[in-house]
Regions:
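Sec-dependent signal peptide recognition
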Residues: 3-12
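C-terminal motif of bacterial Sec signal peptides marking the signal peptidase cleavage site
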Residues: 17-18
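Short linear sequence elements within intrinsically disordered, low-complexity coil regions
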Residues: 12-14, 109
Length: 122
């Protein structure tokens, strides 16, 4: 049983360390790309594919989610106190709603795309 707990703890530590955090300075694209080099590669490939400049991609993500991979709209309040449902199903870097994201996955053939992954959101 002790070995199981050790294995579980190590696995949990590895999973948590693999999670992406918000870049330190989201106002400076150079510092973002210094922290996350792969993000630059993904943004550059998106620029080649769609023609959208990198600074425009980053500006949209900054306004939509502020580079928070788990960003969701704030919950509405019931009687101004009780948290209620969210106004939309938008989520992740792109803040795409469920229907739009499903359409994107069907059109691109990328069934494993997630809204919380930067590569898929740009």
């Amino acid at each position: 049983m002790y070995k199981f707990y050790n294995f579980f703890f190590i696995l949990l530590t590895l999973l948590i360390s693999a999670c992406s955090s918000i870049p330190q300075n989201t106002s400076n694209s150079c510092s973002i790309f210094n922290e996350r080099y792969l993000w630059y590669k993904h943004a550059k490939s998106t620029e080649k594919k769609w023609g959208t400049p990198i600074h425009v991609q980053l500006a949209i993500i900054k306004m939509e989610s502020d580079f928070d991979w788990l960003a969701k709209p704030q919950r509405q309040k019931l009687f101004k106190v009780i948290p209620f449902k969210r106004p939309s199903s938008s989520f992740g870097y792109s803040q795409a709603v469920k229907g739009t994201w499903e359409q994107y996955k069907n059109e691109t053939g990328n069934k494993l795309a997630t809204r919380a992954r930067f590569k898929d959101s740009v």
